[in-house]
Amino acid sequence: MDGGFPQNRVGLVSEIGLMEDSFPPGFENEAKNLAIDFDGVIHNDDKGFHDGTCYGLPIPGSIEAIMSLSQTFRIIIFTAKAKPSRPLVDGKTGTQLVWEWLDRYGIASYVAEVTAEKPRALLYIDDHALSFSNWDETLQSPVLNSLRKGLNVT
């Protein structure tokens, strides 16, 4: 380290002896990672969580989008289905179920990782997100204010 900090975090990992798996998914490739939510973005989950299975069809355009995006980005799928605390479904973890679904629709080879953690990425594609620029705009967001009214919060 020559008395200072390494120029990058991967250097820091080797200098201080941390295990790379102690970092969030995608750490080593964050400069090209694109994180995409599974349910509601790729997988149609119109029945809600249901029993944890991946029962839905692909969201229209999602297959082609992942194939196209994977030419430029390293695709990471993030989903609560992959949480280790979730119960097994037919003896399979949520991560296994997601990989099987991706394989069934021919896109498993375009995806680098499936994780329950928020991965390090350049951009996140999620159906339950609000784009942030500053707090004044965020607090005035029609979407946020609509949710507040629905929850009777002023």
Task: Give the predicted meaning of each segment.
Residues D2-T154:
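HAD-like aspartate-dependent phosphatase fold
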